[in-house]
């Protein structure tokens, strides 16, 4: 697929660089092969936030050159003001002549705070607009979000500290190199003279009808009267030219005109002003011509241009105030933007607006741009350049991935943290051998695997040197270089194998259905949707793939062939196998050059192109057909092959042509056909059956061919027709039955061709096979050995088992494996799958089967208990339950079979109630109501407790009832006037009085009375 030799990791460098530009540049794998050098250029700017805290950054993500974008600040009057252009670090035109942009990513965020600010405020809105800058109608912070409806092209309210990342995705492919406007050698008298070579590829041209008999009338003023004759939106960031003419007519003498062209920037200011006419006198009565021929070089365009206007100044020689001035004008002009229509040059644009950021903060813009560059002659002396690598597989893989980018979650604008988290996912996308674990977590696994299935085969088909045809060189056959192998008739051909297969014991494959397929009467397997590695994909999963040039959406029938060369009359030598399609009409333009010009006539005189001219095709067809090689089939399309395949012959193609002629399907039929007819018109088996089966299986198809077993089609063919809506509704029989040259029992001899060893038709081999068949009929052990061999061959593990046998000569490991493997009926197998015997796939029971087993089990148990009315049918009607107590009592009392789902509650004895004593109720009420020191419970509370005992048939309250009683008691205590008085709260301890001082043992204290 890629140019790497490492088989464990197949990276597509181009898509990796697109999704992760910081990983470096990669050559674009298209067929534009120029010697170039790869270079990564960085862009880093620290932008200061203005007074309003808002601004706008305009990016040109696809521009092939040094220009990256521009920065504008929002003024207090609501208008934007241009700040500066954003460029790459190196001025590319100074060193390089031509350029192609490979990838680009830019990050906008802020992490700095001005003095006095302690919080990082502000948010960012970003949107990618699929148009030019001048086409935006609302560039306000909130209005930007209405520029597109694609959710993957806009994000809003991202914190300025987190930042956003802008990713450049290609808007077109297979593009040429663009001239950079580099300086060219020149000599002039003026030292400031500059000569450059600008891009002339894909210019953008604006045609403006400036005036169509426009009438001007005014009175003379000093300095003249100025009017804007026209103003039109244009887009330019590179050099441009203006050309055209105006014709003026007047009846006033001595009128003088001046004309000025102004190029207006995005902020509304005039970037460039050029006078194209000054003091041009008009002659009355005649046509006065005013031509325009203006060239603006790139170095003068200092900011993006979004409009152009033409101003006319009217005056009069020696005029007096109040004198009348009038004229009429007609004419048009054209504005040519050099390289402006190159994809990515002016559209799309990505706008990143920030709001409410602290004044003086710094918004950092950092990014990388990857280029393919062709150096100028001076630099080329010291810089090695090399050709790009043509890799159509990588290119188509990239196209298919990006065509589904909305469904794969690939955005153009990201929150920076989310983009960083997605890098591992992008690595999975770029690595063809990755297991897609992260993609599976996001739900993208099926889509990417389907794209890989389509894109990978393109390498070997469109670019054979990338993956040569298997065994072609090793076998010494060099038909890829033009030395085609010569068949017996002198013409190289692909033979489908007419010989009878040697083995008559090819049995039908037991596991006939792959995951994602519908099996129809064991006859055909028709995918209703694309199948990729056994995973069913949804219809239309690869809409973008239909845009490839090699994809054909027409009715077709498919058949495989084996490309052979003939060494002698008896020994064909197989080289390769290929799938072919039969399409209606003469379509040699779809064939590879090696097949064109070769055709065979049918019995009715029509032609089949792509067949070797070997006699007459034994068919009567109603029209011409073309046989083309194909590489893949999915949905309702086929992918054509450009391999140098020679013209073909063979019965498989005859069957496919007959099928196409009779039924004319409108879409490719998803079943490959093969078969052979003997001289008597009877169906024979075919050789190369396993090779053809492998060919069909690679495309997710099954091979329908002749076999030794009858297949009863019955009404199932009509079911198949209904499942395939493109077919006519009157197809109620197997199509093979309607082929004009097949025997009546042909349909019953067709089934899915199974894998078999590839035998050569030799007498010795046929006798050996017959001997093996005879031995198998009489020796059961030999029969088992043949069955094991068939099982190994059908599943494609013969070589693996042979290698395993070499490493285990005494079969010790195999015996241990078989001894520990799950056996039919073992406990571990029953626990996981249910019961199953050998040769039968163990599956868990269905819901109906499990219910039937339960009914049988209940019925047998009831029978052992003497309850004979509970039969299996009765249990099923009883909702798969055993008889209830009421049903059993009814049967015991009446000896009549009770009705299912009737419970007979009258026959069930009511529960006996126990009456609680008054003492028990009072004791419980007192315990619940409060402590013994409190007042006795109220009679109302005692009655509540008695009700609980009555409800519980004499038992005490449960937990819920106890909670309710406690709440009731609390309420009654608060409103009870006879409740016990609350205990007085203890007073705080007062400090004791200080005793009087001790005066002596016999001295009495003098009191107040003594003093009186």
Curated annotation (Swiss-Prot):
It is an enzyme of class 3 (hydrolase). Residues 1003-1012 are annotated as: Interaction with VP1 protein. Pfam families: Birna_VP2 (PF01766), Birna_VP3 (PF01767), Birna_VP4 (PF01768). One of its GO terms (biological process) is proteolysis. The active site is at 652 (nucleophile), 692. InterPro entries: Birna_VP2 (IPR002662), Birna_VP3 (IPR002663), Birna_VP3_dom1 (IPR043048), Birna_VP3_dom2 (IPR043049), Birna_VP4_Prtase_dom (IPR025775), Viral_coat (IPR029053). A divalent metal cation binds at residue 30. Residues 513-755 form the Peptidase S50 domain. Capsid protein VP2 self assembles to form an icosahedral capsid with a T=13 symmetry, about 70 nm in diameter, and consisting of 260 VP2 trimers. The capsid encapsulates the genomic dsRNA. VP2 is also involved in attachment and entry into the host cell by interacting with host ITGA4/ITGB1. The precursor of VP2 plays an important role in capsid assembly. First, pre-VP2 and VP2 oligomers assemble to form a procapsid. Then, the pre-VP2 intermediates may be processed into VP2 proteins by proteolytic cleavage mediated by VP4 to obtain the mature virion. The final capsid is composed of pentamers and hexamers but VP2 has a natural tendency to assemble into all-pentameric structures. Therefore pre-VP2 may be required to allow formation of the hexameric structures. This is Structural polyprotein. It comes from Avian infectious bursal disease virus (strain E) (IBDV).
């Amino acid at each position: 697929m890629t140019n790497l030799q490492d088989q464990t990791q197949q990276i597509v460098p181009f898509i990796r660089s697109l999704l992760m530009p910081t990983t470096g540049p990669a050559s674009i794998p298209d067929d534009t092969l120029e010697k170039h050098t790869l270079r990564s250029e960085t862009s880093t700017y620290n932008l200061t936030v203005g007074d309003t805290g808002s601004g706008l950054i305009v990016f040109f993500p696809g521009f092939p050159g040094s220009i990256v974008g521009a920065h504008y600040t929002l003024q207090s009057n609501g208008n934007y003001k241009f700040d500066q252009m954003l460029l790459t670090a190196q001025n590319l035109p100074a060193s390089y002549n031509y350029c192609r942009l490979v990838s680009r990513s830019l990050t906008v965020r802020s992490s700095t705070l001005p003095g006095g600010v302690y919080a990082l405020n502000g948010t960012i809105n970003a949107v990618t607009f699929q148009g030019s800058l001048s086409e935006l109608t609302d560039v306000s912070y909130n209005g930007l979000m209405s520029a597109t409806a694609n959710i993957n092209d806009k994000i809003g309210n991202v914190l300025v500290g987190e930042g956003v990342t802008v990713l450049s995705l290609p808007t077109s492919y297979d593009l040429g190199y663009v001239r950079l406007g580099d300086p060219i050698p020149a000599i002039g008298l003026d030292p400031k003279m500059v000569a450059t070579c600008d891009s002339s590829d894909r210019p953008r041209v604006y045609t403006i009808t400036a005036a169509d008999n426009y009438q001007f009338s005014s009175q003379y003023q000093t300095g003249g009267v100025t009017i804007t004759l026209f103003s039109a939106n244009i887009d330019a960031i590179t050099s441009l030219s203006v050309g055209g003419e105006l014709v003026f007519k007047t009846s006033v003498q001595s009128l003088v005109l001046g004309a000025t062209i102004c190029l207006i920037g995005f902020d509304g200011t005039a970037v460039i002003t050029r006078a194209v006419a000054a003091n041009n006198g008009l002659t009355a009565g005649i046509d006065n011509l005013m031509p325009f021929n203006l060239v603006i070089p790139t170095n003068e365009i200092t900011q993006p241009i979004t409009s152009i206007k033409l101003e006319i100044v009217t005056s009069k020689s020696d005029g007096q105030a109040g004198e009348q001035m009038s004229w009429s004008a007609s004419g048009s002009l054209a504005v040519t933007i050099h390289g402006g229509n190159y994809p990515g040059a002016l559209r799309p644009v990505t706008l990143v607006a920030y709001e409410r950021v602290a004044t003086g903060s710094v918004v950092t813009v950092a990014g990388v741009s990857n280029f393919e560059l062709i150096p100028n002659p001076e630099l080329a002396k010291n810089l090695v350049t090399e050709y790009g690598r043509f890799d159509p597989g990588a290119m188509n893989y990239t196209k298919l991935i990006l065509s589904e980018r909305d469904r794969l979650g690939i955005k153009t604008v990201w929150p920076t943290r989310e983009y960083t988290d997605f890098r591992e996912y992008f690595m999975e996308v770029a690595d063809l051998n990755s297991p897609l674990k992260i993609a599976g977590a996001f739900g993208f696994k099926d889509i990417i695997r389907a794209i890989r299935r389509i894109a990978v085969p393109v390498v070997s088909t469109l670019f054979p040197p990338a993956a040569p045809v298997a065994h072609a060189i090793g076998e010494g056959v060099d038909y890829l270089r033009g030395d085609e192998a010569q068949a017996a008739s002198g013409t190289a051909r692909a033979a489908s194998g007419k010989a009878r297969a040697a083995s008559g014991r090819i049995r039908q494959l037991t596991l006939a259905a792959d995951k994602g397929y519908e099996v129809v009467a064991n006859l055909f397997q028709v995918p209703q949707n694309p199948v990729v590695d056994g995973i069913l994909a949804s219809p239309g999963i690869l809409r973008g793939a239909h845009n490839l040039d090699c994809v054909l959406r027409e009715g077709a029938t498919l058949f495989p062939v084996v490309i052979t060369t003939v060494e002698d009359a008896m020994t064909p030598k197989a080289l390769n196998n290929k799938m072919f399609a039969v399409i209606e009409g003469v379509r040699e333009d779809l064939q590879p050059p090696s097949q064109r010009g070769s055709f065979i006539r049918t019995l009715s005189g029509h032609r089949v192109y792509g067949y070797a001219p070997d006699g007459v095709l034994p068919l009567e067809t109603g029209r011409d057909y073309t046989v083309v090689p194909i590489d893949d089939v999915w949905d309702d399309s086929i992918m054509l092959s450009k391999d140098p395949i020679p013209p073909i012959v063979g019965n498989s193609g005859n069957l496919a042509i007959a099928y196409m002629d009779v039924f004319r399907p409108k879409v490719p039929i998803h079943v490959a056909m093969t078969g052979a007819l003997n001289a008597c018109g009877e169906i024979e088996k075919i050789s190369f059956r396993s090779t053809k089966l492998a060919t069909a299986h690679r495309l997710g198809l099954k091979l329908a061919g002749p076999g030794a077993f009858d297949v009863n089609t019955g009404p199932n063919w009509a079911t198949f027709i209904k499942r395939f809506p493109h077919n006519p509704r009157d197809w109620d029989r197997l199509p093979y039955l309607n082929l004009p040259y097949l025997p009546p029992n042909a349909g019953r001899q067709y089934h899915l061709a199974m894998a078999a060893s590839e035998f050569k038709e030799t007498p010795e081999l046929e006798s050996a096979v017959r001997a093996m068949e005879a031995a198998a009929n009489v020796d059961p052990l030999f029969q088992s050995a043949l069955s094991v061999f068939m099982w190994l061959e059908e599943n494609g593990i013969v070589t693996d088992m042979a290698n395993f046998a070499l490493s285990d000569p005494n079969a010790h490991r195999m015996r241990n494996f078989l001894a520990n493997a799950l056996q039919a009926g073992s406990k571990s197998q029953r626990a996981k799958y249910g019961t199953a015997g050998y040769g039968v796939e163990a599956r868990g029971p269905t819901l109906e089967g499990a219910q039937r087993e339960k009914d049988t089990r209940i019925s047998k148990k009831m029978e052992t208990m003497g309850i004979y009315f509970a039969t299996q049918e009765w249990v099923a009607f009883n909702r798969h339950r055993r008889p209830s107590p009421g049903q059993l009592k009814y049967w015991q009392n009446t000896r009549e079979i009770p009705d299912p789902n009737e419970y007979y509650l009258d026959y069930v004895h009511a529960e006996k109630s126990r009456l609680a004593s008054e003492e028990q109720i009072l004791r419980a009420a007192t315990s619940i109501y409060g402590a013994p020191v409190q007042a006795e419970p109220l009679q109302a509370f005692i009655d509540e407790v008695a009700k609980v005992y009555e409800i519980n048939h004499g038992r005490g309250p449960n937990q819920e009832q106890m909670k309710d009683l406690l709440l009731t008691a609390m309420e009654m205590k608060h409103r009870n006037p006879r409740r016990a008085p609350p205990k007085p709260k203890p007073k705080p301890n007062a400090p004791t009085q200080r005793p009087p001082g001790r005066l002596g043992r016999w001295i009495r204290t003098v009191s107040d009375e003594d003093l009186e």
